[in-house]
């Protein structure tokens, strides 16, 4: 408090409430939380990857059965002459040998592709793996189809012959031989169908939307 000649002033200290009122307001910090949301296409792409893996296992069985059945096909008739022995073997015909090589290569490729297919199950949006698989599957599809088609032509001639070329049907004599090669051809076409499904599924998985 101070006094003067004409006026008297009294200094009143600010109360705690008034001091609080003049204090600057500090806003409470806002914490933004983000929650990872799953990709809308992750579910069906993972399902495709699982189905892809199972189809590859089935294709391995089909190509391996085709290669081993054709590669072990051999039949010798119980009768023979002094100069001839009637025998039929897969390695007598280049088409059957190409069939064995083609299906064996396809079987080996399918076994090597299983780890990549397994990775696609856990990473369904990995585009690079899918692109590699679709290119490789297309090449193997062409190779398996070529082998199956060449063997089919020989099997048809073995069953029916060709009168214009004087080729007789041999399946009436070599029954077991014809049954084995026919079964191998059927197994190879099953593998061809599976390869077609694999290519279509990979193309579907590569779609962005």
UniProtKB/Swiss-Prot annotation:
Transmembrane parts of this sequence: 47-67, 96-116, 138-158, 184-204
Q: Which GO cellular component does the record give, naming just one?
A: plasma membrane
Highest taxon above the source species: Eukaryota
Q: Indicate yes or no for the key word Endoplasmic reticulum.
A: no
Residue ranges annotated as Extracellular topological domain: 68-95, 159-183
Record topological domains on the Cytoplasmic side = 1-46, 117-137, 205-209
Subcellular localization = Cell membrane
Protein's membrane topology: Multi-pass membrane protein
Query: Keywords in UniProt for this one?
Result: Cell membrane, Cell wall biogenesis/degradation, Membrane, Transmembrane, Transmembrane helix
A biological process (GO) of this protein is:
cell-cell junction assembly
Family statement: Belongs to the Casparian strip membrane proteins (CASP) family.
Function recorded in the entry: Regulates membrane-cell wall junctions and localized cell wall deposition. Required for establishment of the Casparian strip membrane domain (CSD) and the subsequent formation of Casparian strips, a cell wall modification of the root endodermis that determines an apoplastic barrier between the intraorganismal apoplasm and the extraorganismal apoplasm and prevents lateral diffusion.
Describe, as the record does, how this protein assembles with itself and its partners: Homodimer and heterodimers.
UniProt cross-references to PANTHER family, sorted A to Z:
CASP-LIKE PROTEIN, CASP-LIKE PROTEIN 1U1
Q: What is this protein called?
A: Casparian strip membrane protein 1
Q: Which organism is it from?
A: Vitis vinifera
Q: What is the lineage of its organism?
A: Eukaryota, Viridiplantae, Streptophyta, Embryophyta, Tracheophyta
């Amino acid at each position: 408090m101070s006094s003067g000649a004409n006026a008297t002033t009294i200094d009143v200290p600010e109360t705690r409430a008034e001091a609080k009122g003049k204090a600057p307001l500090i806003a409470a910090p806002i914490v933004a939380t983000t929650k990872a949301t799953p990709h809308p296409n992750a579910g069906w792409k993972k399902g495709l990857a699982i189905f892809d893996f199972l189809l590859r296992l089935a294709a391995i069985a089909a190509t391996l059965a085709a290669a081993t059945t054709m590669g072990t096909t051999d039949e010798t008739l119980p009768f023979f002459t002094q100069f001839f022995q009637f025998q039929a073997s897969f390695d007598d015909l280049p088409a059957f040998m190409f069939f064995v090589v083609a299906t064996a290569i396809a079987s080996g490729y399918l076994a090597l592709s299983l780890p990549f297919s397994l990775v696609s199950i856990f990473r369904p949006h990995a585009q690079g793996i899918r692109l590699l698989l679709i290119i490789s599957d297309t090449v193997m599809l062409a190779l398996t189809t070529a082998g199956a088609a060449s063997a089919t032509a020989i099997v048809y001639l073995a069953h029916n012959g060709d009168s214009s070329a004087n080729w007789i049907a041999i399946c009436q004599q070599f029954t077991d031989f014809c049954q084995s090669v026919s079964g191998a051809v059927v197994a190879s076409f099953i593998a061809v169908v599976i390869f077609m499904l694999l290519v279509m599924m990979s193309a579907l998985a590569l779609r962005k939307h």
